[in-house]
């Protein structure tokens, strides 16, 4: 898969930046109003009852703030957060080590929770439901099961693929929140806030232009701002202006709707080789040289969101909106 400026997935260089930009409270958090308002109520109710917050599942496309919300939940509850991920928990013993290290009320954040192995999920069920851990000591006929009590804790799971979670695991979450793509105005506010942290002057029109091309995703907006800032420092006087922004994004091959060369390759591949579709996913995969799950999970969601692509029982179809974007006429049936 090509390295991608417009990927919502976290890159190595994003880690320190995201930590420094991360809001600490729900009041500071921009966007996701529905999820935020619900969490405010659930957190306040748990604090009034002096209980731990119910387990929370955050799901939606990458880069929308799931990790940030997990940290905010811990801050609002006044507890510590322990962070891990589905791929990092390889054996039941790994999960047991994490669970037994928790303090009362702590938040355990598991990113990519859909990638937990089923055997590990089974260890998690009694931990989530009864705050206890069943472990097997010994082997063979002499093996015996021992139950350990755990302190009450809140599990916050994050996933880009809620449908990949097993039903028993999903049903054990008391709070399910879907994170939606951000509006241009929300992203513009995020870009301006990031500019303040960077101590870089940014024109409000430039912030709006970056927001329009950020695919509804804060992580992408901040990444684009970093690259535009580089152009402003080298090709300008350090101020992020509209002129600098448009020049930088054109050179970075990010068009006015936030589509890049990979989006163009996918859409034009279907248009030019299959008359716009319908065409099967595996055929698209072979045509553009990308794995089918990458196309489905990484490239297609935004194209579906903006109405440039349709998934049908017969395959993928490029819509009239996409033809219009490329200045092309749809083939006559």
UniProtKB/Swiss-Prot annotation:
DNA binds at residues 311, 316. GO terms for molecular function: ATP binding; ATP hydrolysis activity; four-way junction DNA binding; four-way junction helicase activity. Residues 1-182 are annotated as: Large ATPase domain (RuvB-L). GO terms for cellular component: cytoplasm; Holliday junction resolvase complex. This is Holliday junction branch migration complex subunit RuvB. Residues 183-253 are annotated as: Small ATPAse domain (RuvB-S). ATP binds at residues 21-22, 63, 66-68, 129-131, 172, 182, 219. It holds the Pfam family AAA_lid_4. Belongs to the RuvB family. It is found in: Cytoplasm. InterPro entries: AAA+_ATPase (IPR003593), AAA_lid_4 (IPR041445), DNA_helicase_Holl-junc_RuvB (IPR004605), P-loop_NTPase (IPR027417), RuvB-like_N (IPR008824), RuvB_C (IPR008823), WH-like_DNA-bd_sf (IPR036388), WH_DNA-bd_sf (IPR036390). SMART domains: AAA. Its EC number is 3.6.4.-. Its main location: cytoplasm. It catalyses: ATP + H2O = ADP + phosphate + H(+). Mg(2+) binds at residue 67. Keywords: ATP-binding, Cytoplasm, DNA damage, DNA recombination, DNA repair, DNA-binding, Hydrolase, Nucleotide-binding. It comes from Bacillus cereus (strain 03BB102). Homohexamer. Forms an RuvA(8)-RuvB(12)-Holliday junction (HJ) complex. HJ DNA is sandwiched between 2 RuvA tetramers; dsDNA enters through RuvA and exits via RuvB. An RuvB hexamer assembles on each DNA strand where it exits the tetramer. Each RuvB hexamer is contacted by two RuvA subunits (via domain III) on 2 adjacent RuvB subunits; this complex drives branch migration. In the full resolvosome a probable DNA-RuvA(4)-RuvB(12)-RuvC(2) complex forms which resolves the HJ. Residues 256-333 are annotated as: Head domain (RuvB-H). Has 3 domains, the large (RuvB-L) and small ATPase (RuvB-S) domains and the C-terminal head (RuvB-H) domain. The head domain binds DNA, while the ATPase domains jointly bind ATP, ADP or are empty depending on the state of the subunit in the translocation cycle. During a single DNA translocation step the structure of each domain remains the same, but their relative positions change.
């Amino acid at each position: 898969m090509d390295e991608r400026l417009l990927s919502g997935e976290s890159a190595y260089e994003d880690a320190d930046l995201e930590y420094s930009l991360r809001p600490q409270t729900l009041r500071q958090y921009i966007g996701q109003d529905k999820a935020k308002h619900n969490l405010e109520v659930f957190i306040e109710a748990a604090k009034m009852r002096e209980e731990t917050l119910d387990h929370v599942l955050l799901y939606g496309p990458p880069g929308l703030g799931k990790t940030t919300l997990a940290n905010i939940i811990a801050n609002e509850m006044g507890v510590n957060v322990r962070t891990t991920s589905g791929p990092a928990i390889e054996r039941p013993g790994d999960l047991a080590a994490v669970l037994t290290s928790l303090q009362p009320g702590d938040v355990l954040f598991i990113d990519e929770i859909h990638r937990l192995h089923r055997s590990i999920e089974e260890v998690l069920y009694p931990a989530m439901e009864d705050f206890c851990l069943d472990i097997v000591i010994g082997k063979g006929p002499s093996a015996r099961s021992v139950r350990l009590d755990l302190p009450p804790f809140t599990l916050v799971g994050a996933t880009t693929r809620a449908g990949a979670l097993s039903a028993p695991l999903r049903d054990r979450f008391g709070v399910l929140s879907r994170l939606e793509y951000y509006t241009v105005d929300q992203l513009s506010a995020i870009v301006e806030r990031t500019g303040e942290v960077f101590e870089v002057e940014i024109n409000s029109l430039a912030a709006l232009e970056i927001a329009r091309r950020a695919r509804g995703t804060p992580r992408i907006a901040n990444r684009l701002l970093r690259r535009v800032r580089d152009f402003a420092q080298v090709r300008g006087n350090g101020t992020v202006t509209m002129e600098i922004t448009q020049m930088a994004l054109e050179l970075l091959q990010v068009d006015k709707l936030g589509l890049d060369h990979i989006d163009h390759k996918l859409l034009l591949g279907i248009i030019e080789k299959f008359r716009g579709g319908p065409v099967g996913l595996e055929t698209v995969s072979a045509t553009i040289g990308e794995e089918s799950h990458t196309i489905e999970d990484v490239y297609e969601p935004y194209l579906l969101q903006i109405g440039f692509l349709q998934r049908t029982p017969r395959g993928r179809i490029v819509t009239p909106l996409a033809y219009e974007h490329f200045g092309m006429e749809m083939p006559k049936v």
